Design a protein with these regions (language model features):
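Divalent metal-cofactor coordination and adjacent catalytic microenvironments
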Residues: 1-103
């Protein structure tokens, strides 16, 4: 989790530790979303390596959660609300690359 936290902070250009607990919660939520979307069991990425495309999706989604933490479309998304939808589109596309097929 520490490595992912560092990567999310780099993505957000954060140089302080004040929001580490908050970010860790967002990372946990993003990983849970990835596991669910990819049809993997809960906790899968605690025991198995994360593919780089899945990791990028988790970084993007965690960053999106942080930037949108007040529930509005403020900050980065204030001028273009559809930019938020684009984040979800890209995240889902990246996660699809490592999705388990359930028959």
């Amino acid at each position: 989790m520490e490595e992912l936290l560092s990567k999310v902070k780099q993505n957000l250009i954060l140089n302080h530790n004040e929001d580490d607990v908050l970010l860790s919660g967002f990372i946990t939520a993003a990983i849970s979303y990835a596991e669910s979307y990819q049809k993997k069991p809960d906790g899968y990425y605690k025991e198995n390596p994360m593919h780089p495309t899945t990791e990028q999706a988790v970084i993007m989604l965690s960053s999106h959660f942080y930037e949108s933490r007040d529930g509005s479309t403020g900050g980065f998304f204030a001028d273009k609300v559809e930019a938020s939808q684009q984040v979800w589109h890209v995240v889902n596309m990246l996660l699809r690359l490592n999705r388990d097929v359930v028959i």
